[in-house]
Amino acid sequence: MFKKRLISISLVVTLLISAKIMISDHLAKAHTLMVTANYTKESPEGIDDPKWREAQAVQLLVEGREKSTGDNGTVSTWSLYTDDSLYFLFKWKDPTRSITKQSWKYDGKNWHHLQGNEDRIALLFEITRIDKFATRGCAVTCHSPADEPRDNWKLATKTVTEKGDLWHWKAARSAPYNYADDAWLTVAGSPTGSYRETGRRKDAGKGGDLKNQTEDGTQPLYMQDPFKKPSVPEFLLLEEATKITDYSIFKAGDKIPFRLPIKPSGSRFDVKSISRYANGGWMVMLYRKLDTGHEDDVVFNSMKNYGFALAIFDDSGSDHSKTTEPMTLSFARK
């Protein structure tokens, strides 16, 4: 009798443990953030295209350094795909349209940088598997161990076999050319330029921006070419800029952009964008070929799922303010 009771108790405990594991697995799956791309035969032509109504919006909670609450912490996300391309539409509230990016202002005697940076949105996809990315998302690559000083944090993967595809839309630097800067992520190294010792690498091609300053950094070096009409109001494109030869032409209150967008090309120009700021918020459409043919990009297959993460930058030049939990991109069957 005693042995039977022990067997019964052991069986009950085993069943309870099994049930707990099953419930935990179910809850983990139930809380996975899923963004589903709906199939459409024709490409959406812009932000207002009726085709976006074919996709169901997913409300993604974003929070981080400046913890968000309510609608301010939500990014409405839609996704569509065609036979050869993938499309995203993002909408989020932002009380200010930040495109200043430290523009120059003349006070009548000297030039000074204005306060303010730019709004941005970034997506990171796995090209190859990144350890723990599926459960920790951006934190694995963007935030080094929490006990490390912030100055030691590196945007990187831990091994050379782990690679990420980074899409980085910037309101002041990429939006004027209607694209999101396409980069990829690997182990930390020593690349040239502003990326310093991170794992971030530029895709092949041209893009980015040039700092508009003299060698001593005290004043702007370029101005709008007076013989060229600005193709994008409020911005100074490098291809439309000319060197300043006479600073006496400026009067107090004059402003000149500090960051000059460079015309993009090649793989760096794979991710196109359409954007609009209105009614206290941004709407940004990003789209790209499912397969770009470039090794520095993830290849999307509509029969597979893909892990990714998203971050929102509010008037920020470095740390992102808000990020999502890890997410999965799936494709609805045709």
Regions found by a protein language model. Give the residues of each.
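Beta-strand elements of well-folded, non-transmembrane domains
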Residues: 81-83, 92-94, 290-292, 312-314
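N-terminal Sec-pathway targeting helices
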Residues: 1-9
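Short, well-ordered beta-strand segments enriched in hydrophobic/aromatic residues
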Residues: 85-92, 282-288
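Mature extracytoplasmic or organellar-lumen-exposed domains after removal of signal/transit peptides
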Residues: 79-80, 91, 302, 309
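Beta-strand-rich interaction surfaces with strong enrichment in secreted/lumenal proteins
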Residues: 75-78, 271-277
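Bacterial N-terminal signal peptides
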Residues: 10-18
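A mid-sequence, solvent-exposed acidic-amphipathic segment
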Residues: 245-275
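Acidic/polar low-complexity flexible segments
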Residues: 23-49, 104-251, 278, 293-334
